[in-house]
Regions:
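N-terminal nucleophile
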Residues: 1-204
């Protein structure tokens, strides 16, 4: 993953040293927002032998692609089922790193998530009956702040829709996905956001 990122950045005219320095500006926001995730990344760094500041570059990456999300509740399904659907339109070079991750964190709901190398949590569902997916948005107000992949982990730790919506609209976020939050009851919301603004769409 790191080697792929180095090659991609080099082609875009950004040196690896510059990328590491830029990502470092986000670190204190990330640590304040989710210290448990930072601790997890530290353990990942220790076990993989990849320096933490280099791993962190991957979590501050710009838009990776343009995914598609669909949410359906009982009003639109023949048997009353609720569906939360996501296509992961990823860079081909990184597709081999996509894995399903089953997590049972202490004090938080257990979850099943799509991840990149078990580190970046992309979308998933948890034992509280919540799911979230997200797709990339073009936005013109990106800034130094909490990386949106940190929001993804906290979304999976949410126990209620209101808690998940609070996470999705974190005021110090660096940027945002189009975040789709769904509950097993059929309640669903789309939070279409950027770094400094968002629109809330209720899926009736």
């Amino acid at each position: 993953m790191v080697s792929n990122e180095k090659s991609r950045l080099k082609k875009s005219g950004v040196s690896w040293e510059e990328a590491v320095a830029r990502a470092g500006e986000y670190f204190r926001y990330a640590g304040s927002f989710d210290p448990d995730y930072v601790e997890w990344l530290g353990a990942y760094s220790d076990s993989s032998g990849i320096p933490l500041n280099e791993l962190f570059v991957l979590l501050c990456d710009s838009e990776k692609g343009f995914c598609t999300d669909i949410m359906l509740n009982g009003k639109a399904t023949a048997d009353g089922s609720v569906f939360s659907v996501h296509t992961e339109d990823w860079r081909p070079a990184d597709s081999k790193h996509l894995v399903l991750l089953k997590g049972r964190p202490r004090g938080e709901p257990s979850y099943l998530a799509m991840s990149s190398a078990g580190m970046e949590l992309i979308c998933g569902m948890n034992s509280s009956g919540l799911s979230f997916t997200g797709n990339s948005l073009d936005q013109n107000d990106m800034r130094v702040g909490v990386p949106k992949l940190f929001l993804a982990r906290r979304l999976l730790a949410s126990r209620t829709i209101s808690e998940a919506m609070f996470v999705a609209t974190e005021e110090d976020r660096a940027s945002s996905y189009n975040v789709n939050i769904c509950h097993k009851s059929g309640e669903m919301y789309c939070v279409e956001g950027s770094a400094t603004d968002y629109a809330l769409i209720y899926g009736a």
